[in-house]
Amino acid sequence: EEPQNLAARGGMLVASCLGGIAFLKGLGLVHAISHMVGAEYNTHHGLTNAIVLPVVLRFNLPTMEEKVKRMSDAMQFDDHSVESFISNIEKILDRIQIPQSLSEIGVPESCAARIAEKAMQDLAYATNPRLATFEEVHKLVLASIKKAR
């Protein structure tokens, strides 16, 4: 929005570095699902991650209240509850006009089971903070296709 704003650009640089550190800690279900969607439908990985993010957050965050408080604080959100955190993330996604479902970028419902099965074989799946069964991953994929937010 403000390419000449050095403070904002510096903040993005720090965020990029933190993202790299997070990458080393493990990627989880957002990436596992996105890897498989991208492989089959040639979607942009970052966009696919952004679409899937709210669905997986809803699945993961109830078991991560302490981390949600730290993330909310770092993002300067006033309310540190799980639901407020997800709501704030969704507002950001809306603001930058991220599609609200994978179907909007050409992913059909018919692939949900196949994507879920493949996602569970992805190395990123093993680092998800909450274990998920096939049925749970299938529901996450289907929700992401129909209406992620």
Locations of regions flagged by a protein language model:
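Short alpha-helical scaffolding segments that buttress acidic/His motifs in well-ordered protein cores
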Residues: M12-G19, L53, I89, L93, ...
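Gly/Pro-rich interdomain helix-loop hinge
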Residues: E40-C111
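Short coil/turn segments at secondary-structure boundaries
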Residues: A7, S84, S103-G106, R130-E135
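Carboxylate- and glycine-rich phosphate/diphosphate-binding segment that chelates Mg2+/Mn2+
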Residues: E1-K25, E135
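Glycine-rich phosphate/pyrophosphate-binding beta-alpha loops
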Residues: C17-N49, L123-T127
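Residue-level detector of well-ordered alpha-helical segments, enriched
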Residues: A8-G11, L29, T48-V52, K67, ...
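Short, amphipathic C-terminal "tail helix"
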Residues: E109-R149
